[in-house]
């Protein structure tokens, strides 16, 4: 998503992005010889089976004999193919190819202008994706974003590096190139390099990066995502780690865009902006600019394709994770997403007015890009609360860190019955949580463990919104309370609040009303009077 539009002629004139100086510069075997942790070495050994002869390719070759491959396509002209061949990104086959690649270019907008990046998509991806053979499983693990944020919180500065055309630096063993054929009108080529469009490519690239950045210097954090590397710590320690990393890169032929060590206290990394002094994070300027564009786009009130909406929602959800935006505030926008997401990419949608209002508000908050605390230290639990609901009331138990216990049992009010369908646990359980928190949690509490036997609400809390309106209301209430709530599931038979919700609201009964049924949450089931009146989305 960008704010610039280009004519068809401008796109046609955009040059192919090729860096011949980096092609096949890396020696992957040398990476195995580097000093590194056992975990890094094990990950690297697993990844290298995709670029060296291994049982993986015997399994692929066996499946190629019966697998119905898609038709392959190519969008490069003869002059462009010659450029790719001269840059050693294509080579002549030594044996006839057994599988083919799609070959095309994607547009990239850079400061110097529009350019086209050549992409090769091996059709053996389909075999890997559909195979039940465990040999063909692909596992890629990136540095968790929360680990990066914690490192910024605990450190003085950072230094980052970026490999130049990283995939082009990684050679494919000659015996494997027959699985990566490129068919043209004038002849046949094969790929001598790791293809960016190959399903296991990120696993290979990430494992190689992890191996090289494993400098083993105390008090230094290192993180990476494919070709981007970050070191944080004290100035002296980061300088030492960066120097070692540069030397290790040179020793295996890995080319960096720059070998200059720049120690910074504020910088962008993987879409977020970090400040070591203020200890804050926000969106990078590039991502914030995209949020501005999304805001202006939404204000135009034009019909949008599924592809455009997916891009907008992806950006807004990313911003929510960075800026701690409460997604539950935008319940109807999220319901709309669950409706359109599976429709064809080119289908046009008219965004309902209430959904558009929420999306504009969301994009406005994202574009303001107000910094938030980069990381929050774990604090001691002040209270543990158990909640439960029945058709006639709710109950809760609060246990303080000092061990004092407070029990509460209340019937539903007339207003509760008027506002919510309390015969459904999907509405009753979240309402019980809201009432229990309001009654039992002081505003001074910093952290609360909240147990419920309503498992669907636990899933909703992990996503920060619930498909049921009652879930989103409860999550928004908890987010605005100023306390950190950890939502945990407890089986109903072990929930001590169960008897408090059921046993005291039916005179003459020792057992109380029956347990509430767990109502399905779906497009045709509504759990409050308000949601029912609004009608089904779409």
Predicted regions and their residues:
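Reverse-transcribing Pol proteins
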Residues: 3, 7-137, 224, 323-357
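Reverse-transcriptase-like RNA-dependent polymerase core
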Residues: 21-62, 106-119, 164-189, 204-214, ...
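Catalytic-core region of right-hand nucleic acid polymerases
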Residues: 68-206, 248, 285-334
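Catalytic palm subdomain of template-directed nucleic-acid polymerases
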Residues: 126-136, 169-171, 217-252, 273-282, ...
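A short, polar/acidic, helix/strand-boundary loop motif
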Residues: 186-211, 297, 400-431, 439, ...
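Active-site palm subdomain of RNA-directed nucleic acid polymerases
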Residues: 202-246, 258, 436-452
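C-terminal reverse transcriptase regions that engage the nucleic-acid substrate
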Residues: 263-374, 498
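RNase H catalytic domain
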Residues: 437-497, 502
């Amino acid at each position: 998503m960008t704010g610039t539009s280009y004519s068809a002629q401008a796109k046609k004139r955009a040059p192919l992005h090729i860096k011949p100086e980096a092609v096949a510069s890396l020696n992957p075997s040398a990476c195995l010889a580097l000093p590194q942790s056992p975990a890094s070495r094990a990950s690297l050994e697993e990844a290298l089976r995709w670029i060296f002869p291994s049982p993986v390719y015997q399994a692929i070759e066996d499946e190629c004999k019966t697998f119905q491959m898609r038709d392959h396509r190519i969008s490069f002209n003869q002059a462009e193919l010659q450029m790719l061949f001269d840059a050693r990104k294509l080579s002549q086959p030594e044996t006839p190819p057994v599988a083919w690649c799609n070959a095309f270019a994607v547009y990239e907008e850079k400061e110097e202008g529009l350019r086209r990046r050549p992409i090769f998509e091996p059709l053996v991806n389909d075999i890997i994706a559909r195979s039940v053979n465990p040999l063909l499983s692909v596992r890629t693990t990136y540095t968790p974003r929360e680990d990066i944020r914690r490192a910024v919180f605990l450190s003085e500065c950072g230094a980052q590096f970026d490999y130049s055309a990283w995939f082009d630096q990684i050679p494919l063993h000659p015996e494997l190139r027959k699985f990566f054929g490129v068919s043209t009108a004038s002849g046949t080529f094969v790929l001598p390099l790791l293809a960016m469009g190959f399903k296991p490519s990120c696993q290979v690239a990430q494992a190689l990066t992890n191996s090289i950045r494993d400098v083993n210097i105390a008090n230094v954090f290192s993180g990476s995502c494919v070709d981007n590397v970050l070191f944080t710590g004290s100035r002296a320690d980061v300088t030492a780690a960066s120097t070692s990393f540069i030397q290790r890169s040179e020793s295996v032929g890995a080319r960096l865009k720059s070998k200059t060590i720049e120690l910074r206290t504020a910088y962008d990394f993987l879409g977020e902006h970090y400040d070591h002094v203020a200890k804050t994070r926000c969106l990078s300027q590039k991502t914030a600019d995209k949020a501005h564009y999304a805001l202006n786009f939404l204000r135009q009130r034009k019909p949008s394709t599924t592809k455009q909406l997916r891009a907008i929602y992806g950006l807004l959800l990313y911003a929510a994770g960075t800026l701690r935006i409460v997604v539950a505030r935008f319940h109807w926008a999220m319901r709309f997403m669950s409706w359109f997401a599976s429709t064809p990419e080119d289908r046009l949608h008219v965004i309902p007015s209430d959904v558009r209002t929420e999306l504009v508000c969301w994009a406005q908050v994202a574009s303001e890009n107000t910094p938030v605390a980069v990381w929050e230290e774990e604090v001691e639990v002040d209270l543990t609360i158990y909640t439960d609901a029945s058709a006639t009331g709710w109950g809760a138990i609060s246990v303080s860190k000092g061990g004092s216990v407070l029990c509460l049992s209340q019937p539903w009010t007339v207003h509760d019955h008027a506002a919510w369908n309390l015969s459904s646990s999907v509405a009753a359980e979240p309402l019980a949580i809201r009432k229990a928190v309001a009654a039992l949690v002081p505003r001074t509490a910093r952290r609360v463990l909240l147990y419920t036997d309503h498992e669907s609400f636990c899933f909703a809390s992990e996503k920060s919104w619930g498909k049921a309106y009652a879930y989103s209301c409860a999550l928004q209430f908890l987010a605005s309370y100023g306390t950190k709530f950890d939502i945990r599931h407890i089986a109903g038979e072990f929930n001590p609040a169960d008897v408090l919700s059921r046993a005291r609201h039916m005179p003459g009964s020792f057992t109380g009303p029956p347990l509430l049924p767990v109502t399905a949450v779906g497009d045709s089931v509504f759990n409050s009077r308000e949601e029912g009146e609004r009608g089904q989305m779409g």
